[in-house]
Amino acid sequence: MSWLNSVLLALTSVQPYMVPATVIGLVSFAFLCFIFFYFFRAVKIINGLKKYTQSINGIENNEPGNQLQHLQSLFVQPELKHAWNEFEESLHSQYELEDGEEKIVRIRATAPSASFFSEQQLVDIPLNTEFFKHLPGILTGVGIIGTFYGLMIGLNHFDPSTPEQVSSSVNNLLRDVLYAFLGSAFAITFSILITWLEKFCLAKCYKYLEKFTAALDALYDSGVGEEYLASLVKSSNESATQARHLKESLVTDLRDMLLHLANSQKVENERLATTLSTTYRETGQQFAEQVSGAIENSLKSPLDKIAGAVQTASGDQSGMVQNMLQDVLTAFMAKLDTTFGQQFTNLNEMMGQTVGAIQTMQTGFGALLQDMRQVSDDSRQGSAQLIEQLLSEMKSGQQAMQAGMNDMLTSLQTSVAKIGAEGEGAGERMARQLEKMFADSEAREKAQAEHMTAFIEAIQNSVQQGQSATMEKMAASVESLGEQLGSLFGQIDKGQQQISANQQANQQSLHEQTQRVMSEVDDQIKQLVETVASQHQGTTETLRLLAEQTNRQIQDMHTGADKMRLAAERFEHAGDRVSEANHLTADVLNKAQSAGSSLSLATSELTSVVADYRNNREAVSKSIAMLELLAANTQSEQTTRTQFIADLKQHGERLQSYNREAQAFMENVSDVLGKGFEDFSEGVSRSLDKTLGKLDVEMAKASTLLAGSVEQIGESVSELDDVLSRVRA
């Protein structure tokens, strides 16, 4: 501790007036540095921004090319030249043709100038604001250190040994404290002055920088990307409408052209047919005339010579020739008769035989149709008569049964009367008959009872099987329910463990995400300027691609029109060939149609008659079968109806008892299931209450941590908002 005492002694051995003198000297030196390195530079920056703003406002009405040249010559300083080069690259020049030359008509801005002429580049870095904004705090700290140093010197000189020394020491202490507070007051005063000057100069710099960027933005209108996008959309819509109109006009023109071609082709075909028919007729007549004339000319002279030779010949020769000619002619006529005459007679006979066969076939078909109609009528009449006969027989049988019953009743009455008259013998005979009747009735009742017992046993077996199956299914369902409850409780426990693990992971991820968000905010601010330039390049590239695509679409439309013209020409040639084929096939179809119409009529009548005959035959067979079943059923139903009704009543009572037992069983099952579900709901509610309580505690912790993180983010966002507001200002 001796070295510490020596240090304190060395520090407190200074005279008290040296403390405020030292503080004043340090503060004065800091103030002079502030004036030279901050205030004068701030005034220089303010004057420079004023000069630039006035110069920019002065060239507002000049030509765009002159404006660019003036600004290039204006921004020659290093801190402004780089920013101006970047801003100049973001400008978009619009050209128009004037006297065969492209000239700049206007220049559009794609990004605000404040993004390039930033506050940090033009104000903060030249003025060293990050250092000088902390200078008032440093001076205040120097004043406080001087105050404490003066107190240390005064306390070191304080001597409390005697009352006289105490009074003198108090005076010295107060004087030393006064010196110390004097230096502290000087330091605090100058720190206030420096703070005011620093904030005032910084605000002025920001103000004139904002005016400078506003004047620079006023030279160039923005929104070029939106205008190009709107014009692009407009041009694409116009091209789409033009393509649609072109398509509609092409379709209508092609339709009209095809109709005109078809009509003209039809007219030309008719005209060609008429001309061909007339030419064929004329050429035929001319050919016949030429052939007849040629034959006449060629045979006239030989015949004349023959006639002359015949006339000059002798009478005997003429007679011989005449006889020979007569013989030749008779032989020739006989030969013709034997050849062509027999053939014609045979043909006539064959035609007559064919006509006769056709007539006989026609009469046969007519007779067949008449017979089939007669058969169908006879079958309908026979079936109607049979039905009437069956109904009459049923009525007669019923009347006979009624008469038999009446006769039986009358016989019973007479037998009763005879019983009363005859006495014991008749009573014994009647008793035997009644015993026989009762025995027969008991036998029938036993058979029916056995049948009903078998039926009831089958029903009981089916009911027991159904009950056993339902009990097995319910037991299986209860077991599966228990397994599901066990798995559910296991899942709830796993869910609680997962929730706790997820909460810890969420807390850790939330802390990491807050740090990541703060780092990402800084990165996004840096990437903002880069994205603006990339968007400008992307917009220009998109415009170029759209122009190329529009040109390709127009070329495709031209090629499509050429293809449609070629298709129309091919269609015209095909129409010529089709019209020729239609004329050839029309004759064939007419002949085939005339031959098939007669056959279709005959076959349709034949098929209708056959179908009617089949339908009538099936209807008659069905009616006969139904009548047979009806007769059998009426005979059996009369005997078994009453007994069947009694058996049904007994069976219904037993089924009601079975239903009551099943209802009681289902009520017991519902009670057991209700209790099980209540226990399950209580267990689930208890586990959920515990889980939710733990979850609320963990969520409260997480919310407190999240609130702290959100406050930090809010502070960061507020600082970012201040920076952005300064940039906008």
From Swiss-Prot:
One of its GO terms (biological process) is defense response to virus. It is found in: Cell inner membrane. The chain crosses the membrane at residues 20-40, 135-155, 177-197. Disulfide bonds: none annotated. Disruption phenotype: When this gene is missing the Zorya system does not confer resistance to SECphi27 in E.coli. One of its GO terms (cellular component) is plasma membrane. It is a multi-pass membrane protein. It comes from the Bacteria. Keywords: Antiviral defense, Cell inner membrane, Cell membrane, Membrane, Transmembrane, Transmembrane helix. InterPro entries: ARM-type_fold, ZorA-like_t1. Component of antiviral defense system Zorya type I, composed of ZorA, ZorB, ZorC and ZorD. Expression of Zorya type I in E.coli (strain MG1655) confers 10,000-fold resistance to phage SECphi27, 100-fold resistance to lambda, and 10-fold resistance to T7. While most T7 infected Zorya-containing cells undergo abortive infection, a minority produce viable phage progeny. These eventually accumulate to a high multiplicity of infection, leading to culture collapse by 2 hours after initial infection. ZorA and ZorB probably assemble in the cell inner membrane and exert their effect there. Belongs to the MotA family. NCBIfam families: 1_anti-phage_ZorA1 (NF041794), antiphage_ZorA_3 (NF033916). This is Zorya protein ZorA. It comes from Escherichia coli O139:H28 (strain E24377A / ETEC). The gene is zorA.
